[in-house]
């Protein structure tokens, strides 16, 4: 079923401003972050789609700088939570305290750092599962319950978490069910020679320009609503569904590589993520409906953290990205 022509015209007109605002934020981030264009775009796709993003990379690659730069480019309240083994759930969500008032002693809720619009959860896998779940519950419900009282989180609410892939001692890896709550998992790689030279020029000579605020909360919420209005044709939707089902071992669309190397495949949230990311990409291209290529472009960041590899994959050095590329090569766009 296609969208009405009036709706198509309205979406395409709004797409112009969406594309301009996306480019403005990207430009401001680039003032501080050298390179990592795909990672920056992935973070912005997650923001405008209304999801949360997990960044993985070794220390010193600019993950925290990217997130700080984004908060500076947006007129949003920012907080950073450094996850450590001794961090308690109340340190994240807040706690109820007793205060002296004119009327005597009263209970008062003191808000934790989760009550911001952009939250950096730094080294999330260093905290205990109990503390991790406090953050992840807020991500899912967009609210915090303390002492039987529910406190709504302000819109937009965007969490970016970081984790280090090599320091495994003293860490608590996120369980699959909690990883599933992240819209994208983005891998931050090393900079090129030219990028490293540019980093040195900016950080050792005082050349780094100031980041300007180019977007506010109301504009972001408006863009998030626009994304939901983009049409996904039935055949494109079916392609996204078949890609997700192809990750299910022994399923009707599973490839031989999936059957060999995967223990569990992606959940329905993966299909939702792929569809929303495809809608964002369509808007960036000035279109009112998503295409097969839009779907293909979001498969890796949407599903790499939702596929659980088996022992044979670990022994053979096969990762989720390799299996997902095989699926993209094997599953045809058209079902016919």
Model-derived features with residue positions:
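Canonical AAA+ ATPase core
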Residues: 99-105, 127-131, 139-230, 279-281
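P-loop (Walker A) phosphate-binding loop of NTP-binding proteins
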Residues: 58, 92, 162
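C-terminal engagement/docking regions of AAA+ P-loop ATPases
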Residues: 1-12, 249-336
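Pre-Walker A (pre-P-loop) alpha-helix and adjacent loop at the N terminus of AAA/AAA+ ATPase modules
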Residues: 14-61
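Conserved alpha-helical scaffold flanking the Walker A/P-loop in AAA+ ATPase domains
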Residues: 42-45, 98-120
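Walker B catalytic acidic pair
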Residues: 57, 122-123, 134
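Walker A/P-loop
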Residues: 47-85
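Conserved C-terminal "switch" segment of AAA+ ATPases
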Residues: 11-19, 32, 171, 185-257, ...
């Amino acid at each position: 079923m296609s969208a009405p022509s009036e709706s198509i015209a309205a979406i395409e007109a709004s797409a112009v401003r969406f594309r301009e605002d996306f480019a403005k934020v990207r430009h401001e981030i680039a003032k501080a972050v050298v390179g990592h264009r795909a990672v920056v775009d992935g973070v912005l796709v997650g923001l405008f789609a209304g999801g949360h993003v997990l960044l993985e990379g070794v220390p010193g690659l600019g993950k925290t700088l990217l997130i700080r730069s984004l908060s500076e480019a947006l007129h949003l309240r920012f907080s950073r939570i450094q996850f450590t083994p001794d961090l308690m759930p109340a340190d994240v969500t807040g706690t109820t305290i007793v205060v002296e008032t004119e009327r005597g002693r009263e209970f008062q809720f003191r808000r934790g750092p989760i009550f911001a619009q952009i939250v950096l959860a730094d080294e999330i896998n260093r905290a205990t599962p109990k503390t991790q779940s406090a953050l992840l519950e807020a991500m899912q419900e967009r609210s915090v319950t303390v002492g039987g009282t529910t406190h709504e989180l302000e819109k937009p609410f965007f969490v970016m978490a970081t984790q280090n892939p090599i320091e495994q001692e003293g860490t608590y890896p996120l369980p699959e069910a909690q990883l599933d709550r992240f819209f994208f998992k983005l891998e931050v790689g090393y900079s090129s020679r030219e990028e490293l030279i540019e980093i040195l020029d900016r950080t050792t000579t005082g050349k780094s320009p100031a980041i300007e605020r180019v977007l506010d909360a109301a504009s972001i919420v408006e863009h998030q609503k626009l994304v939901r209005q983009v049409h996904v044709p039935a055949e494109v939707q079916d392609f996204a569904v078949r890609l997700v089902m192809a990750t299910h071992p022994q399923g009707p669309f599973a490839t031989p590589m999936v059957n060999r190397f995967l223990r569990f495949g992606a959940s329905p949230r993966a299909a939702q993520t792929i569809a929303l990311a495809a809608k964002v990409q369509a808007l960036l291209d000035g279109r009112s409906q998503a295409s097969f290529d839009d779907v293909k472009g979001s498969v890796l960041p949407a599903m790499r953290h939702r596929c659980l590899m088996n022992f044979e994959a670990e022994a053979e050095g096969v990762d989720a990205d390799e299996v997902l590329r095989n699926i993209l090569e094997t599953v045809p766009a058209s079902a016919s």
